[in-house]
Every structure is written in C-alpha cells, then in structure tokens.
C-alpha cells in the first residue's frame, strides 16, 4: 500500500475515487428515484462531444467541454419536459448524435488523442488540477444537498405534490442535470465517458436492495461505491503492466455489477422461500 502512495498519480486517483464515490451516489439517488437513469448515459456522451469540440477548436478545451455539456444538458431536459417527443426518443437522439459528433471531430483534429483514455479513463491521465475540480464539484453537491434535501426529496417522490407546495420544480430539475453534467466532465479522466453513468446508478440499485429508506439508501450507496472504487483503483495499479494498462473504471463497474447480482439473487431467494413457506 505504501508503494502506491509513493506515486503522485496514484494518490490523485485514490483521492479522486473517494470524492467521486461520495458525489455520484448523491446525485444518482435523485436520478434513479425520478426514473431517468438513462439520462446519465446520455450526459456522458454529451461530455464526449464537448471534449471533441474543445480539442478540435483547441480553445480552452476544459471550459469548452463544460459550456457545451451544460447547454446541451439543459436543452435535453427542456425537450424531455416539453412532451414534443417521447423522453426515450429524445435521449436516443442526443445519445447517438453526440457520439457521432465526438467521433468525427476527434478524427478531424490535428492533435494526437488517445480515444481509449477518453472512453474508459486512465490512472496515468489524472492530474492534481482534476482533483481540485472534483473537490469543488463534490463540496458543492454535498452543500446543496444538505440545504435543499427536503425539497429535492419531495420532488423525487412526487412532482405534482411539489408544485402544489409552490416548489420551483424546474429550478431543481435544471440544477440536478447541470451538476450531473459537470460531475461527469470532471471525472472523465479517471473513469471515462462510457462507464461514469454506472457509478451514478449501480450503487443506488445495490442499496435499494438492502433498504427502503431514502436517506439510508444514499449512505449505503456511498459505502458500496467507496469499497468498489478504492478496490478497483488499487487492482488497476497491481494488474496493469506496460504496455497494457487496465482502466480502473472497468474493474470498478465489474465489482459493482457482481455485488448487485449477488444481492439481487439473495433477495429473490428470500422471496421464494417466503412464498414456499406460505403454501
């Protein structure tokens, strides 16, 4: 373990994984409870397009990515709320279009870009600046959640009830999707755009198999996410060997998927046993 801490990139990776493991489940709980889990996938693809635009223009890539992701995510939410098209159709259009835009622009770019690192992340790609960005976003998410927890909870449970109580639902919807977009952008270097949505959804799905309490679900999800993220990052370091470097995101998602499968099977077996005992 001390060997890992002797490398700056590993220290950054461990800190980043801790911050992401706390932040992602908080936002993920509100995403899952509103039954818009696929929004995470779409937002990650929008981030991919944003990165490609920034690289292609060679003009403050990070700020360009943030700006594009925020604008595109707000447009996505607006179209989903307008009922002009089915929400699934809107997500599908943004999902495929953003991936296409990103692929074309990166191909046309004069810069040498490792697409695999953008898609899946890399331990070697994480910088101290990335950690600072993650910490800023993480603290913002925690503070906002603490001060607006009650309203966010009611909105997640019942939109109509929230409107009756004169809660500005649109504001909190916009806030959720903007924070999620920014979190995805600042976490791309570590986990990549393809698997970041799994960190939003899987820990929550695991926690929901263990408790029905909203607040407890968040805390359990954070615990599970911390366990899998730290294990995934550490395993990535020990399993990788030049020139083969295993992205930590893949290992993290495999661990989360395995735990989800286990708790799901265990719960189903309990239900089956109860049904059998009643006959």
Task: Specify the residue positions occupied by each region the protein language model found.
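Interfacial loop-to-helix junctions that mark the boundaries of transmembrane helices
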Residues: 4-13, 56-63, 84-89, 123-133, ...
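Short loop segments and helix-boundary regions at transmembrane helix junctions
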Residues: 29-111, 207-222, 235, 239-245, ...
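Alpha-helical transmembrane segments in multi-pass membrane proteins
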Residues: 16-24, 46, 50, 54, ...
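Hydrophobic alpha-helical transmembrane segments
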Residues: 14-19, 62-67, 92-93, 131-136, ...
């Amino acid at each position: 373990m001390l060997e890992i801490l002797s490398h700056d990139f590993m220290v950054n990776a461990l800190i980043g994984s801790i911050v992401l493991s706390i932040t992602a489940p908080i936002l993920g709980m509100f995403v899952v409870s509103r039954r818009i889990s696929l929004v995470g996938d779409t937002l990650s693809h929008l981030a991919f397009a944003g990165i490609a635009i920034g690289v292609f223009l060679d003009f403050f890539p990070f700020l360009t990515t943030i700006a594009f992701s925020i604008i595109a995510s707000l447009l996505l939410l607006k179209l989903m709320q307008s009922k002009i098209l089915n929400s699934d159709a809107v997500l599908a259009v943004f999902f495929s279009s953003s991936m296409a835009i990103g692929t074309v622009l990166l191909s046309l770019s004069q810069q040498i870009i490792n697409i695999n690192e953008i898609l899946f992340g890399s331990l070697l790609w994480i910088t101290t600046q990335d950690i600072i960005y993650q910490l800023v976003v993480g603290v913002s998410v925690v503070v906002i959640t603490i001060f607006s927890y009650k309203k966010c909870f009611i909105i997640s449970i019942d939109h109509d009830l929230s409107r009756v109580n004169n809660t500005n639902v649109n504001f909190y919807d916009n806030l959720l999707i903007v924070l999620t977009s920014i979190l995805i952008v600042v976490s791309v270097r570590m986990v990549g755009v393809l698997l970041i949505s799994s960190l939003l959804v899987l820990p929550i799905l695991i926690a929901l198999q263990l408790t029905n309490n909203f607040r407890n679900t968040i805390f359990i999800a954070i615990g599970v996410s911390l366990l899998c993220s730290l294990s995934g990052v550490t395993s990535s370091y020990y399993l990788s060997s030049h020139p083969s470097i295993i992205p930590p995101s893949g290992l993290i998602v495999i661990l989360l998927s395995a735990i989800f499968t286990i708790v799901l099977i265990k719960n189903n077996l309990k239900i089956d046993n109860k049904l059998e005992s009643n006959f």
